[in-house]
């Protein structure tokens, strides 16, 4: 690929797409990690709500524990049980349970979301690179990647939080995707995710960002449960989730990955007009 020289605004096509994993590409509802965090805290005698477990979703998993323990509600319960406010040793203690629990359960949450295969085919049919990144660690991805591949999903690049100095909201995983895909500039890339952390990461990387809601963390429903929920209730959940992603900086918000290729075409039209993904 010919290097882009930044003496002008980039007005070419989208060159690559970077997908989040749980809640975006696989694991409808981001159910796997949410359940693990609830269970890990329970092992330490502290009950946490699923909503509390979901709040920092998208973060590197140790940081996820740290952010949960920093919540006033969780910290108060921790103090009531353990007699002290949470500190770094407590982060380590909870995380020591998170890692094996994730490794035990992650394979069951490798099912691609509806529409992923068709989206991947269209992206590759256009010659775009297909990257991915995740708050999961290296050992977790050693389980998840082959399980997803067995079900038909194999991105060109996989970057996990263990490979970079800091996970989301820092942009390093997106930059590493760009390096491995050989793609530049960053505004020729689109990040698709389902969490606030995804949106912040992409914005910090100077990428276009697309939020997905129906399959994502904030709606938090399996494919079956989403189909069974009364339409007005599901729509209300999705409206709240969409607003949260927009507030976090999403350029576009859609129901799921199945709706994302039309967004890529819309982004290309904006690029051709000289638009950029970052504020002036």
UniProtKB/Swiss-Prot annotation:
Its EC number is 3.11.1.1. It catalyses: phosphonoacetaldehyde + H2O = acetaldehyde + phosphate + H(+). The active site is at 20 (nucleophile), 61 (schiff-base intermediate with substrate). Binds 1 Mg(2+) ion per subunit. It is an enzyme of class 3 (hydrolase). Transmembrane segments: none annotated. This is Phosphonoacetaldehyde hydrolase. It comes from Nitratidesulfovibrio vulgaris (strain DSM 19637 / Miyazaki F) (Desulfovibrio vulgaris). The lineage of its organism: Bacteria, Pseudomonadati, Thermodesulfobacteriota, Desulfovibrionia, Desulfovibrionales.
